[in-house]
Each structure stands twice: as structure tokens, then as C-alpha cells.
Amino acid sequence: MAYKRHNVSVIMERINEQRRFIQIVIGPRQTGKTTAVSQALEDFEHPFLSVIATKGESTADWLRAQWYRARQLAGSGPALLVIDEVQFVPNWSSVVKTLWDEDAQAGLDLRVLLTGSSATLIQEGLDESLAGRFELIESTHWTYPECAEAFGYSLDEYLFFGGYPGAAPLRRDRRRWLRYMNASVIEPSIVNDAMRLSEVRNPELMRRLFSVGAPYSGQEISYRKLLGQLDDRGNTATIAHYLKLLGDAGIMSGLQKYDPK
């Protein structure tokens, strides 16, 4: 039987409540958001429509069409609309706001659950249009107890491979594991998340910062030492800024030095 994280029960509880808020599953890439939603839907007793938005193809009109289909399911009682990868729909948050408010005025019990692989783009949409209309359900990196129970990780394996469930079966073949992590986690997180948060004038420097900084996980390293390993490209302010963006994207972050003053 597939392992179920705690957030599966949270999702189940929320979608079985009366319609109050849009539920949004948010978290770093490759942490099992879609899987958790699918597991929760297995025990959902009302009609539901589950769709996946596609980059470059799913338009605002497509989103409206899915919503109208779901409204038909809610004609005689509660129903649920699930939209995965909603960040691929241009201007998605304002479209969702309009449709959600229409349902509220009509007294329609259409519940809505949204997910997306880009936590940063989801958060951007929430800040723009949906204030007061949503609740977040966190999908964090997997903890050591979860990885130990689900995949048989030792503590050393967890510290080395991290809390990424999709990559866990590949850990015996480190080259294959690394290719997967680069293609599915690292590069998308840098290009589609971190670089979308703020202007990045030197994308290659950000990539180099990650590749140089990652081996220092859990260790002290100064910005000046990092700069030296980056061949003195950039400056400490740029490095600090890029590190913050990588942290917001959920792949690498730094701890500030403690100052009792």
C-alpha cells in the first residue's frame, strides 16, 4: 500500500468541509503534492472533476470551461474542482477570484482545490487577487521519519539524498539519481521559480552559486569565500540576493550569523 503523508488527511478534511475557502496545496517541487491530492480523492464521496493545466495551452477560457463543467456536478449537491499546475494559466488568480465569487453569490457548493509545481508563481497569484479567499496546505520536503518508513532510509542516506520521494528509488544508482535531480528539481527550481521572483542579471552566476554552495550544506562559509570559488564574479550583495531567491524557491538557503546585539 502506498505511503500516505499527514497532509493527505488534512486535504481530506478540508475538501469534506462546507465551502469556505479555496484550498491550495503549496510547497517545493517534487514533494508529492499531486500524489497527496490523488490519495485524498480516493475517499471523497461527492462528484469531482480533476484536470491538469498545460504550459502554453491552458488559457483563461480553458479554466472557465473546466469551472463550468464542475458547476454542472454541483447542481444537486456538493462537488469539487481540482486544478493541478494552475500556475500555467495566464492571469489564473483573477479568473479564479471572479468564478469563486460568482459561486458564492449563487449559493453553489462547488469546492475548489488548486496545486502547482511552482510555489513562487502560486504565491505571486495569491498576493495579487485572492486575499481572504484561500487556505494553504503545506507540502514540505519529506522528514527523516517519513523517508525511513516509506523507503527504508538510514539517517546518512536521508542527509545525503534529502526528502525527495520521487528520487528515492534511484539512490542505488547515484549518476541516475543526480540526472533526475538536475532535470526535475534543480534546473526547474532555478529557471522557473528563483529567476521569476526577481530580476536576475546573471543566470549563470546563480547556477554556479548553487553548485558551489550545495556541498557546504550544514557548514559555515563566508560570502567572500563563496566569491573566491565563483572566480570573484559578482559581489557579496549579489550573492546574498541570489541566495535569498534560491531559498524562496525551496532549494538552498543560508542562515544569518547570530548577533546578540
Predicted feature descriptions by range:
Residues 49-77:
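Short glycine-rich substrate-engagement loop in P-loop NTPases that contacts/grips substrate
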Residues 25:
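Hydrophobic anchor at the beta1->P-loop junction of P-loop NTPases
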Residues 1-15:
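N-terminal pre-Walker A segment at the start of P-loop NTPase domains
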Residues 33:
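Conserved lysine of the Walker
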Residues 178-261:
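Accessory nucleic acid-recognition modules appended to NTPase machines
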Residues 36, 40:
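Hydrophobic positions on the alpha1 helix immediately C-terminal to the Walker A/P-loop
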Residues 120-135, 151-152:
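Short regulatory helix/loop adjacent to the ATP-binding pocket of P-loop NTPases
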Residues 93-114:
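Conserved catalytic/switch belt of AAA+ P-loop NTPases
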